[in-house]
UniProtKB/Swiss-Prot annotation:
The lineage of its organism: Eukaryota, Viridiplantae, Streptophyta, Embryophyta, Tracheophyta. Its main location: plastid. Residues 282-303 have a biased composition (Basic and acidic residues). Keywords: ATP synthesis, ATP-binding, CF(1), Chloroplast, Hydrogen ion transport, Ion transport, Membrane, Nucleotide-binding, Plastid, Thylakoid, Translocase, Transport. This is ATP synthase subunit alpha, chloroplastic. One of its GO terms (molecular function) is proton-transporting ATP synthase activity, rotational mechanism.
């Protein structure tokens, strides 16, 4: 007769129950009807929303773009080669999110925030949505702190404040990325975290930017998010949102961040590809009708926070490529309308050897002057006005055989001022040296020199001031003002250097 032991049976059942690790979940699933070019048309799942993540049975994740009565169109975030007709797909009920932490500093990641630099995994402290609401009006405060770029052509005349959105716009090969790259090393010691987002570029230029950051010691406070032209269009579309999420992580921890989007026009091309393949209705230049909503979302999250959220800030600097200087094209105007100003780089100035090729007349900064220090305000106004008015006499002088004296003087002053704004790369200037150089041009101290003598002399003049006449810098640096004593000493120093420079030329 079988001997039944109830206590032993109970212990076996309890042990097996404790080891049971299967979970029961309710998911809305669907079936792939058609797949190709990274686009899947799915029958079901019920209730899927636009922007929701969907997952195939092999683990490939995609984003639902179209939600129609009987099917949904989704774009794959991978190569999509393993997805076949008849495959099962489930709705996750989530939107895209990434891991974030301080460990991302000094690293290179892709749109899903996975490392791509071969230095191992990145320890994450928390997840963050790639698309989150921008700070509200109550959470913001007016821009009042300067974001120094170290460029004499921008800081005095087109100033940028922390929390501002300043566009860098220009034709191909005019130095847009160079301006952004030069700004990053200048943030050393300023408690600023930099986020560089490369969108749809070739792999070699993106790698060169990262290498430049490493050479200048800027990578220790920089995060690079790179999605080159090879990955799927979905990754290029998501890259700016990943960068914005990383910048927000630091901003809400009372840090100041600078995020560079290079460049949103490539994101628009990727979004156009994503939209045309699922047969969404095309609009102007074949872009979908909601492309004006595409570009404002990442820059709008830039802000200067008020005291309650911690007074952190995110400064956004998108770069956009124009064709033949056409700033009124569709994508450039979309991005321009979302920013607080623009730094316009001219192809004509670039071809003439002016670096950086900033066109002061077209460039503007709407909220930046409120963040400018007093010393820079005191000296910059006159120089900006002269450079903005210089284009007209310069153009007329090319056709006039004998221009009048006033036109000749104005043209000569403009040429000298332009020479003073030339700056080699990389050579960021501290504020006090920018003030001295700008004041020298605005006050006419360089008028006694021939234009040929002005070429190369600004760097020598700054070196002379630092070595022999440090008093003006010692006044400007702590007080942020340009006093009469500083002006007097600076005038004497420039006069001495000009005389010695002219003497050397004669010898």
């Amino acid at each position: 007769m079988v001997n039944i032991r109830p206590d032993e049976t109970s212990s076996i059942i309890l042990g097996q129950t404790a080891q049971y690790d299967q979970e029961v979940g309710v998911f809305s699933t669907g079936t792939v009807l058609q797949v190709g070019d990274g686009i899947a048309r799915i029958h079901g799942p019920d209730g899927v929303t636009a922007g929701e993540l969907v997952e195939s049975e092999d683990g490939t994740v995609g984003i639902a773009l179209n939600s129609e009565p009987d099917n949904a169109g989704a774009v794959s975030m991978g190569d999509g080669s393993t997805i076949q007709e008849g495959s099962s797909v489930k709705a996750t009920g989530k939107i895209a999110q990434i891991p974030v932490s301080d460990a991302y500093l000094g690293r290179v990641a892709n749109a899903p925030a996975q490392p791509t630099d071969g230095k191992g995994r990145i320890a994450a402290s928390e997840p963050r949505l790639t698309e989150s609401p921008a700070p509200g009006i109550i959470s913001r405060r007016s821009v009042y702190e300067p974001m120094q770029t170290g460029l004499i052509a921008t800081d005095p005349m087109i100033p940028t404040g922390r929390g501002q959105r300043e566009l860098i716009i220009g034709d191909r090969q005019t130095g847009k990325t160079a301006v952004a790259i030069d700004t990053t090393p200048n943030q050393r010691g300023q408690n600023v975290i930099c986020v560089y987002v490369a969108i749809g570029q070739k792999a070699s230029p993106a790698a060169q930017v990262v290498s430049t950051f490493e050479e200048r010691g800027a990578m220790e406070y920089t995060v690079a998010v790179a999605e080159t032209a090879n990955p799927p269009a979905t990754s290029q579309y998501l890259a700016p949102y990943t960068g914005a999420a990383l910048a927000e992580y630091f901003m809400y921890r009372k840090r100041h961040t600078l995020i560079i989007y290079d460049d949103p026009s490539k994101q628009a091309q990727a979004y156009r590809q994503m939209s045309l393949l699922p047969r969404r209705p095309p609009g102007r230049e074949a872009h979908p009708g909601d492309v004006p909503h595409l570009h404002p979302r990442p820059p709008e999250r830039a802000a200067k926070l008020s005291s309650q959220p911690g007074e952190g800030s995110t400064t956004a600097s998108p770069t956009v490529e124009t064709q033949a200087g056409d700033v009124s094209a569709y994508i450039p105007t979309n991005v321009t309308s979302t920013t607080d100003g623009q730094i316009f780089l001219s192809a004509d100035l670039s071809n003439a050897g002016v670096r950086p090729a900033t066109n002061v007349g077209i460039s503007a900064s709407r909220v930046g002057p409120a963040a400018q220090i007093k010393a820079t305000k005191q000296v910059a106004g006159k120089s900006k006005s002269e450079l903005a008015q210089f284009a007209e006499p310069e153009a007329s002088a090319q056709f006039a055989s004998d221009p009048d004296k006033a036109t000749r003087n104005q043209s000569a002053r403009g040429q000298r001022s332009r020479e003073l704004l030339k700056q080699s790369q990389p050579a960021p200037l501290p504020v006090e040296e920018q003030v001295a150089t700008t004041h020298a041009g605005a006050s006419g101290f360089s008028d006694v020199s021939e234009i040929g003598q002005v070429q190369g002399s600004p760097a020598q003049s700054r070196e002379y001031l630092v070595t022999n006449k440090p008093e003006p810098a010692e006044i400007v640096r702590p007080t942020k003002t340009f006093t009469e004593r500083a002006e007097t000493i600076l005038k004497e120093a420039i006069k001495e250097h000009t005389e010695s420079f002219s003497l050397k030329k004669q010898i």
